[in-house]
C-alpha cells in the first residue's frame, strides 16, 4: 500500500508540485514584503508612545506566554467560546504543520521513509481542517444566531469566515480530484485522507491527458491563490486575525508587578501630569489597543457597564485604538520631527472628545475587566492616567471627590465632619498601646480612616482589637500619628497627594522600626503592600483575614460559640482580584461553629464589585442602577442571613444598599472580624 501511495506522490511532485512550489515561493516573497510592511507600520505606531521597560524577566515572560497561548488558560474559563477557540487554534496548527511537512521534506530529499511522512502529513492536515470547520461553525452559530450582546459584528468578521471555508473546501476538492482521477487505490486515501476521499466520490473523473492541467488549476487558482490572498489581507488590512501575532506579544509584555499597584509618576521630572493625548501613553499601553479582539469579556464583567453606566471597557479600548490609528496619517512626518528633537504632538486631546469625563469617572478600578481579558490588556492604568490629567493639570473632578481630597490634605483622613479621634475605638480594649510609648510590639495595627473614625466601621476595629487581646498578641497603634494611606488620592488621580501621604507614613513606620503591619482595609493593605515599596517602604503587610487565619491555625484563638448563621462571603476587589486573597476569609468562616456557608454566583476572581472602589466611596452614582444594590441582590439570592465582608468600604455599601432595598430583616452585613469576635465572646448576639 505504501509503495503504491509513494508512486502517486512521485508523479504528483514531478508533474504538479514543482510548478506549484515555484509559484508558492514567488508568493512567499510578496507575503514577506507585506509582513514587513505590516510590522513596520505597527512598530512606527508603537513608537508614538513613551518609553517603558517591559524587557525584564525574559524567561518568566516566555513561560507565561507559552502557557497562555497553547493552553488557553483564560479563554477556556468560558466553556463554549473556549472550546470553539481551542478547536480553531489547534486545528490551524495541525493543518499548517501537515501542509509544511511535504515541501520541506521534499526540499531536503527526505526518503527514510518518505511514505510515512507524507501519509501522516495528509492525515494531520485533514484532522486540522475538520477541527477548524467545527470551531468555525460554533463561532458562526454564536455570532449570527445566539448573538451575545457583547459581540459586535463587522464586515471583516463575515469575510474571514467565508474565506477560511473556501480555502478548506478547495483543498478538499483538489485532493479529492487527485484521488478520483489519479488511479490510486481508494483504501489508502480512505485511511489517510478521509474527508478528501469522500469528496472524491462526488467529483467527476477526467481524461488522463487533462488530469495534470485540471489539478494545477484546482491547486493554484482555487486553493493556493485564495490562501495567499487571505494571508495578504490579514497583514495589510489590520484584520482582527492579526491577534494571532499581537496577542502573544501583548501577553509576553504583560506587567509582572503586583496586580494592585499603579505605575508611579516621577513628579520632579514631569512637565505635565497624566495623559491627555494618545502620545502620552507608553508603547505598551498602545500595544494593548492593538491586541484587543473585541471579544467583549471585559464588558461582560464590568460592574459599571452592567449597572447601566456610560463606561464600557471594550469601547474605551476600541475608541482609543481608532483614535490612535487616526493619528497616523502624518505619522512619518511626526517621526522625522522626533529625530530632529522636536518631539511628537498629535495636537488632539482624547479627554472630552474620544473618551468623555463621565466614562473616566465611572470606573471603580475593580479589575474585573483585566481579570477576564485573554490578551492581558491593562485598562485601569489608562483610565487612572486620564484622571491624573484631569485632577492635576485641569483641576476637574467630581465635587464630592474633591472634598475627600481636601479632607486628606487638611486632616489626614477622608472622614469629613467626624468629631472622633483615631484612638476613640480602642478605649475599652486592653493591651492596645501607642508606638510612641512602646514600639516593642509583635505587630503594628494600621487601623485606617474608616475603622478609626466612622461609627459603623469602628465596630470592626473594636472586634479585631478583642481578637488580638484574646490571642494575647502584643500589638501597637500609631494613634494620631497615623494618616490616610493615600489610596483614595491615588485612585481619584491626585498622585501628588498620594506620594505625600505615602512618604509621611513610611517615615513614621521607619521611625518606630516597624517590621510587620496588619490592616483591616484591603485598600490600605494593597497600598502598603504593593505601592509603598515604590517609595522605599518595604514591610511585611498582612490583611486582618490573613492574620486571623494565622492565629487560628497556630491555636492562639479558640472559636467556641455556636453562631447558628447562614453566611455568604463577598470577595472585595482589592483583597481578591488585586491581591489573590481568597482562601483565608473562607477558612475563617468555615472554622466558625454553627455556620452554614454558601457562595454567591459571582465569587472568587469573578466577584462583583460593591461599587466603592476607585474613589467611588466619595462619588455619587448618577446614572443606572447602584452597583451596591446589584451586589446586594446577588447576596439575597443565597437566602443567607449574613453577608460577610473583609473591607470597610464593602461593609458600608452593603449597609446602605440593604436599607435602600428594605432587606434589613433578611440579611445583615458583618465583617469577618465581627463574626470571629462573636465566636470567642462570652455571649453570642444572634
Listing of model-derived features with the role each one plays in the protein:
Residues 35-53, 105-108, 140-158, 173-189, ...:
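Juxtamembrane/interface segments at transmembrane-helix termini
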Residues 54-55, 77-82, 114-124, 145-169, ...:
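Membrane-interface segments at loop-to-transmembrane junctions
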Residues 2-138, 145, 280-289, 311-317, ...:
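Iron-sulfur-cluster electron-transfer modules
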Residues 199-214, 261-273, 379-686:
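Iron-sulfur cluster-binding electron-transfer modules in prokaryotic oxidoreductases
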Residues 86-96, 160-186:
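Hydrophobic alpha-helical membrane-insertion segments
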Amino acid at each position: 500500500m505504501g509503495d503504491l501511495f509513494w508512486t502517486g506522490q512521485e508523479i504528483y511532485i514531478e508533474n504538479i508540485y514543482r510548478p506549484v512550489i515555484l509559484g508558492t515561493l514567488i508568493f512567499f516573497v510578496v507575503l514577506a514584503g507585506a509582513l514587513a510592511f505590516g510590522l513596520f507600520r505597527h512598530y512606527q505606531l508603537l513608537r508614538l508612545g513613551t518609553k517603558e521597560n517591559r524587557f525584564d524577566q525574559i524567561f518568566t515572560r516566555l513561560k507565561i506566554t507559552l502557557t497562555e497561548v497553547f493552553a488557553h488558560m483564560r479563554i477556556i474559563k468560558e466553556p463554549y467560546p473556549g472550546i470553539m477557540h481551542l478547536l480553531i487554534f489547534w486545528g490551524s496548527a495541525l493543518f499548517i504543520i501537515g501542509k509544511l511537512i511535504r515541501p520541506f521534506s521534499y526540499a531536503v530529499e527526505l526518503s527514510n521513509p518518505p511514505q510515512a511522512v507524507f501519509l501522516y502529513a495528509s492525515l494531520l492536515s485533514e484532522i486540522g481542517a475538520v477541527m477548524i470547520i467545527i470551531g468555525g461553525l460554533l463561532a458562526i452559530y454564536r455570532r449570527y444566531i445566539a448573538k451575545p450582546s457583547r459581540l459586535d459584528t463587522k464586515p471583516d468578521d463575515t469575510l474571514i469566515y467565508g474565506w477560511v471555508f473556501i480555502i478548506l473546501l478547495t483543498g478538499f476538492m483538489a485532493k479529492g480530484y487527485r484521488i478520483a482521477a489519479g488511479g490510486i487505490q481508494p483504501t489508502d486515501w480512505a485511511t489517510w485522507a478521509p474527508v478528501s476521499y469522500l469528496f472524491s466520490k462526488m467529483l467527476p473523473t477526467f481524461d488522463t491527458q487533462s488530469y495534470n492541467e485540471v489539478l494545477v488549476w484546482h491547486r493554484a487558482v482555487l486553493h493556493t491563490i485564495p490562501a495567499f490572498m487571505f494571508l495578504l489581507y490579514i497583514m495589510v488590512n489590520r484584520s482582527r486575525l492579526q491577534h494571532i501575532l499581537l496577542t502573544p506579544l501583548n501577553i509576553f509584555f504583560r506587567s509582572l508587578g503586583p496586580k494592585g499597584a499603579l505605575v508611579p509618576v516621577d513628579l520632579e521630572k514631569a512637565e505635565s501630569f497624566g495623559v491627555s493625548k494618545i502620545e502620552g501613553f507608553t508603547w505598551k499601553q498602545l500595544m494593548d489597543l492593538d491586541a484587543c479582539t473585541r471579544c467583549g469579556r471585559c464588558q461582560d464583567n464590568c460592574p459599571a457597564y452592567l449597572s447601566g453606566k456610560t463606561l464600557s471597557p471594550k469601547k474605551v479600548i476600541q475608541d482609543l485604538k481608532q483614535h490612535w490609528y487616526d493619528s497616523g496619517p502624518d505619522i512619518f512626518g511626526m517621526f522625522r520631527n522626533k529625530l530632529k528633537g522636536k518631539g511628537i504632538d498629535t495636537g488632539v486631546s482624547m479627554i472630552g472628545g474620544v473618551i468623555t469625563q463621565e466614562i473616566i469617572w465611572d470606573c471603580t478600578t475593580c479589575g474585573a475587566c483585566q481579570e477576564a481579558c485573554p490578551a492581558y490588556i491593562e485598562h485601569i492604568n489608562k483610565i487612572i492616567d486620564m484622571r491624573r490629567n484631569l485632577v492635576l493639570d485641569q483641576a476637574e473632578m467630581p465635587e464630592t471627590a474633591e472634598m475627600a481630597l481636601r479632607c486628606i490634605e487638611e486632616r489626614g483622613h477622608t472622614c469629613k465632619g467626624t468629631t472622633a479621634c483615631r484612638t476613640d475605638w480602642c478605649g475599652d480594649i486592653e493591651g492596645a498601646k501607642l508606638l510612641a510609648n512602646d514600639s516593642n510590639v509583635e505587630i503594628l495595627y494600621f487601623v485606617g480612616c474608616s475603622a478609626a473614625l466612622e461609627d459603623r466601621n469602628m465596630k470592626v476595629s473594636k472586634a479585631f482589637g478583642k481578637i488580638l487581646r484574646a490571642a494575647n498578641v502584643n500589638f501597637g497603634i500609631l494613634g494620631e500619628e497615623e494618616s490616610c494611606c493615600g489610596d483614595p488620592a491615588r485612585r481619584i488621580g491626585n498622585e501628588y497627594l498620594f506620594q505625600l501621604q505615602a512618604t509621611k507614613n513610611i517615615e513614621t513606620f521607619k521611625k518606630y522600626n516597624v517590621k510587620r503591619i496588619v490592616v483591616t482595609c484591603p485598600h490600605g493593605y494593597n497600598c502598603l503592600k504593593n505601592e509603598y515599596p515604590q517609595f522605599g517602604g518595604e514591610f511585611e503587610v498582612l490583611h486582618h483575614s490573613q492574620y486571623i487565619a494565622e492565629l487560628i491555625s497556630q491555636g492562639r484563638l479558640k472559636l467556641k460559640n455556636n453562631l447558628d448563621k447562614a453566611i455568604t462571603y463577598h470577595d472585595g476587589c482589592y483583597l481578591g482580584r488585586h491581591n489573590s486573597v481568597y482562601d483565608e476569609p473562607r477558612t475563617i468562616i468555615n472554622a466558625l461553629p454553627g455556620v452554614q456557608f454558601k457562595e454567591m454566583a459571582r465569587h472568587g476572581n469573578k466577584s462583583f464589585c460593591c461599587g466603592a472602589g476607585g474613589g467611588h466611596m466619595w462619588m455619587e452614582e448618577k446614572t443606572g442602577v447602584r452597583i451596591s444594590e446589584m451586589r446586594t441582590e446577588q447576596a439575597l439570592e443565597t437566602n443567607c442571613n449574613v453577608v460577610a465582608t473583609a473591607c470597610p468600604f464593602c461593609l458600608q455599601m452593603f449597609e446602605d444598599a440593604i436599607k435602600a432595598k428594605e432587606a434589613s430583616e433578611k440579611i445583615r452585613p458583618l465583617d469577618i472580624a465581627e463574626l470571629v469576635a462573636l465566636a470567642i465572646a462570652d455571649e453570642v448576639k444572634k
